[in-house]
Amino acid sequence: LGTRLITGFGKQLRFGGEVMKNVAGYDLSRLMAGSFGCLGVITEVSLKVLPKPRQSLSLRLPLDAEHALAKLAEWGQQPLPISAASHDGQALHLRLEGGEGSVAAARERLGGEPLDPLYWQQLNEQELPFFRDPRPLWRLSLANNSPLLALPGEQLIDWGGAQRWLKSSASAEAIRTAVAAVGGHASCYAADHCDSPFQPLAAPLLHYHRQLKAQLDPQGIFNPGRMYAEV
């Protein structure tokens, strides 16, 4: 909801607030979450928290990736208590959360077999067998209704299709071109496999990045070159 940070000028600024629909200051707090420490030192964060669901149930459904994406698009238009969805290349994994009645009704409708909830922690910590593949790791960010990309290697679908992990030896150019064709971008998690970890920016976007950096950190003190060499 809000942040406090120290800028390159040595000033402490506050963006956002501590309640929903707060209009105090410019809404730059969201930018800080993905800035990798390039815009300032975060000293305080205000977060929105939610109560723990009364019921949680994880399921495994034997669907291939293409059919899983189609089902997720269909279920996304329906009032189902799906809080997480992932496909590990073998099956679709779902987490249902909410009231006892709604979770039970969804289980009856969707079918599947029980899944150890530890799966979600292992996915979050990248401890699943998929991540042991020695090939370079890529994070693909794209619309959740994007089709399965025809890229060499293995893919793991997360966030209901909006985040996809790729293990592939394909070139950075080939991967980023394929992802850009569906309106997404690709980040490389193998430092020795690509020149920059992030998708190259178009000239107008790079201009905005430079201007924002100049406003908060004109001396280039904070993490210079971490995101882009030009910033």
What residues fall within each predicted segment?
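Short beta-strand-to-turn element immediately C-terminal to the catalytic PLP-Schiff-base lysine
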Residues: I6, E44, R95-E97, L166-S168
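A conserved active-site cap/scaffold subdomain adjacent to cofactor or substrate pockets
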Residues: R54-L118
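Short, surface-exposed charged micro-motifs
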Residues: G2, A84-S86, E154-L156
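Conserved glycine-rich FAD pyrophosphate-binding loop
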Residues: G89, E113-V231
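A short, polar/proline- and glycine-enriched secondary-structure boundary/capping micro-motif
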Residues: A24-Y26, A105, R176
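Short helix/loop capping segments that flank catalytic or ligand/cofactor-binding pockets
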Residues: R14, V103-A105, P224
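FAD-binding subdomain of flavoenzyme oxidoreductases
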Residues: L1-P81
